[in-house]
């Protein structure tokens, strides 16, 4: 039947030039019952209206596998997906896939090349179908184990370059601790940025897992005492994490437990920590790209997608934080007394202006025109192509740059593959400012540092500064060497003449 075929071409968002109509379709006649056809029709129509062409191609492969599964002997009496609970369906699907020689795990490669494993696409697709068809959860959002931030009745303080949509409490294994944590997170969301709250939730998951293994009788935060905390802090300090991560974890755990203590009147929690529990922060090594490294990176960056290449080059030329670059507005360019200026909205603080070169102004103007031609009027210059009302996402850029580095095997001066640290471009910019012999106040102003003492890091990394500061010592060492060579005979005289 014609209406049992759902064509991609019937949906404007799935139009793909050069694709034959018959190649882009879902065939509902593959399903054994009318009830199953209607159930899958609802989900497929939803996906076709909201998904991308590439995602739907992947969906179709998974759908075809599931259609074969539903026609197998084990399902011969099944009329509807509602005839079994979701976990039973998933268990049976996994068994069928193994029988058919279809892998039930998917290898996932991170942007850094590390490999992890998760459920195969077919299983994830079936989970989504079952969830879509399941009963609507009518509980208040804060009663659920996964919160949709858009459904909370508070304004979320977030950085628009990061796509945070949910908070997941499912891996806090003790039900009472999970509920206590929800109350604390809800309170902290009203005063803290979402990134800070995410850190608190992360350490609570780690703490919960530790309690489950080592103190399985503990069911509530009211039962946590100093001995339990000390044992956990020892466990945390012996894990393969950095000192700075441990320090942040302890601070986040303290904040979360003290909030729980205040809400539930668990007085013990408010006095559980002592100052020495927080490990001293180890200052991270201040690194900067060499000129050769910058040349190698930029040679490949300029071959990437034109708007991403512009974004990264503008980021380097401005010396801003990546969040400031990605949230630049189309009206950011101005001229004052013949000088091109740019207005920058800082996510963390305020907005400010700084002078820029004519070349940078032209590059910005090209970026603005590109976005206007492709997406019309937008709030940001660099936009998320799927959601143009939002800025380009940090992880999207990171993934594309790291993929390029892996593909090109692009290495630094030490023979190691480049990482992706947008702050390194900022360091390079700062070092170049010091080599122009600008004063600390001007450098701090151009980099929008609040304190002048931050400038010392850039000065220490400057090759010019190192050359100036070590010239006298190097000359003294040379004199000593020459004095020694002078005693060894005429054959070494040539060394001094060549110097």
Label each residue range with its predicted role:
Residues 1-272, 300-303, 313-314:
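Charge-rich, intrinsically disordered N-terminal extensions
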């Amino acid at each position: 039947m014609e209406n049992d075929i759902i064509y991609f071409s019937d949906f404007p968002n799935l139009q793909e030039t050069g694709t034959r109509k018959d190649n882009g379709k879902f065939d509902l006649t593959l399903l054994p019952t009318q009830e199953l056809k209607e159930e899958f029709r609802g989900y497929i129509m939803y996906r076709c209206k909201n998904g991308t062409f590439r995602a739907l191609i992947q969906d179709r492969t998974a759908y075809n596998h599931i259609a074969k599964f539903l026609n197998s002997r084990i399902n011969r009496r099944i009329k509807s997906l509602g005839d079994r609970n979701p976990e039973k369906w998933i268990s049976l699907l996994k068994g069928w896939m193994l029988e058919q020689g279809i892998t039930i795990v998917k290898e996932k490669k991170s942007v850094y090349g590390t490999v992890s494993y998760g459920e195969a696409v077919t299983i994830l697709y079936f989970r989504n179908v079952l969830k879509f068809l399941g009963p609507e959860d009518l509980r208040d959002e804060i009663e659920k184990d996964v919160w949709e931030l858009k459904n909370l009745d508070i304004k979320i303080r977030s950085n628009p370059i990061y796509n945070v949509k949910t908070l997941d409490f499912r891996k806090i294994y003790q039900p009472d601790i999970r509920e206590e944590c929800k109350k604390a997170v809800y309170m902290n969301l009203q005063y803290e940025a979402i990134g800070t709250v995410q850190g608190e939730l992360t350490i609570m998951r780690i703490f919960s897992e530790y309690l489950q293994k080592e103190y399985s009788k503990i069911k509530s935060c009211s039962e946590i005492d100093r001995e339990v905390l000390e044992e956990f802090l020892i466990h945390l300090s012996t894990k393969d994490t950095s000192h700075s991560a441990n320090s942040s974890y302890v601070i986040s755990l303290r904040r979360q437990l003290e909030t729980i203590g205040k809400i539930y009147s668990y007085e013990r929690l408010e006095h559980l920590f002592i100052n020495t529990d927080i490990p001293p922060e180890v200052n991270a090594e201040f690194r900067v790209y060499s000129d050769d490294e910058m040349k190698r990176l930029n040679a490949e960056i300029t071959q990437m997608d034109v708007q991403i290449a512009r974004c990264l080059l503008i980021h380097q030329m401005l010396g801003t934080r990546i969040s400031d670059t990605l949230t630049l507005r189309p009206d950011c360019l101005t001229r004052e007394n013949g000088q091109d200026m740019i207005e920058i909205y800082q996510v963390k603080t305020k907005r400010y202006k700084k002078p820029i070169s004519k070349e940078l102004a032209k590059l910005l103007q090209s970026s603005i025109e590109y976005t206007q031609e492709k997406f019309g009027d937008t709030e940001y210059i660099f936009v998320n192509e799927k959601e143009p009302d939002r800025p380009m996402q940090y992880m999207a850029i990171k993934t594309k740059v790291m993929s390029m580095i892996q593909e090109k095997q692009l290495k630094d001066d030490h023979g190691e593959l480049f990482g992706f640290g947008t702050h390194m471009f900022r360091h390079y910019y700062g070092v170049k400012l010091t080599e122009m012999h600008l004063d600390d106040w001007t450098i701090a102003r151009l980099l929008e540092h609040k304190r002048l003492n931050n400038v010392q890091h850039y000065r220490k990394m400057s090759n010019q500064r190192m050359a100036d500061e070590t010239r006298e010592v190097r000359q003294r060492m040379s004199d000593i060497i020459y004095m020694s060579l002078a005693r060894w005979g005429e054959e070494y005289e040539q060394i001094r003449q060549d110097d």
